[in-house]
Amino acid sequence: MTLRRRTLLTGLAGGLVAAGAAPAVALDRRRVLHVRPGDSVQAAVDAVEGGGRTIVVHPGTYREVVNVPAGVGELTLRGATGDPRDVVIVYDNANGTQKPDGSGTYGTAGSATFTSAAPGLTVRDLTLANDWLRADHPEITGTQAVAAYVTGDRSRFSHVRLLAHQDTLFVDTSALDAFDRQYFSHCYIEGDVDFVFGRATAVFADCHFHTLQRDVAFTPKGMVFAPSTARANPHGILAVRSRITSGAEDAAYKLARPWVPSYETTAWPSLVVRDTRIGPGIDPVAPYTNMRDAYPWQSMRFHEYRNTGPGSVITVPENRPQLTFAEARLHTPATYLGDWEPLRSL
């Protein structure tokens, strides 16, 4: 077991639960399913009938893959104690991991520990992690290892820890022409390369993004954001009232780079980081870079507004496009989420 896996699993109440453990899911009269050590979270999801159910996961580390299908609407998945460190759902597939049936590799989205296509999903007070490590698998070149892959409109995460390295959180949409909305509040998200990425309208409020140390000689060592917003969507990724810290040396990371997927070459990535403290781990002189030179970041919708901290210092103005006061009024959680008010029922 590596040091990272020991750190992830140490100090958690309850036992280690295997994905194949026989389910012993209890359903009470309040439409609540309880999952305890020895049970499977996926078994609880499979037992859901109808909308509006709640799954309460009791303290423990549950080593399994969890998939919430689109038909399970308005589901709440929450940790029992309110402390996200007490409940950990973790697995270790990567993009390049071979499937057991020999049908190929998982791919980026398929590597996710937690997948949801359900509209109206709420996840709170737990940890979603992918503890696959590059050092343990030098033969694998597809090193993306996703902790959570989320599609479906009105998905919300509150007080959730999302832990991985490359591609930690994939904020996607249910279709190329869908503008699915996702809301993350008071979440902790760590990783190294493109660890918050995708095409959803995704709002991060009061969140903590943390870049990890990497044992590599090159810089940048990674990027926090990699949006792939559809050209027709006026709203991509918004980070507000958040903070960005780093376990690496100063200026080792970029704030973002645009992702224009081969399956959607018309994408026009959109990112706004505002009212956020950016630590010294982000390169202040050149905070953005390209994924491919054919799609330069300067042609994308990348903006900042009223950020603070050493990583936010504007030394070369053309390298840090800023919103005006009037423009900033168009980039708020309310304007991004429209008629959906996720805080009302959290």
Give the location of each predicted region:
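N-terminal export signals
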Residues: 7-26
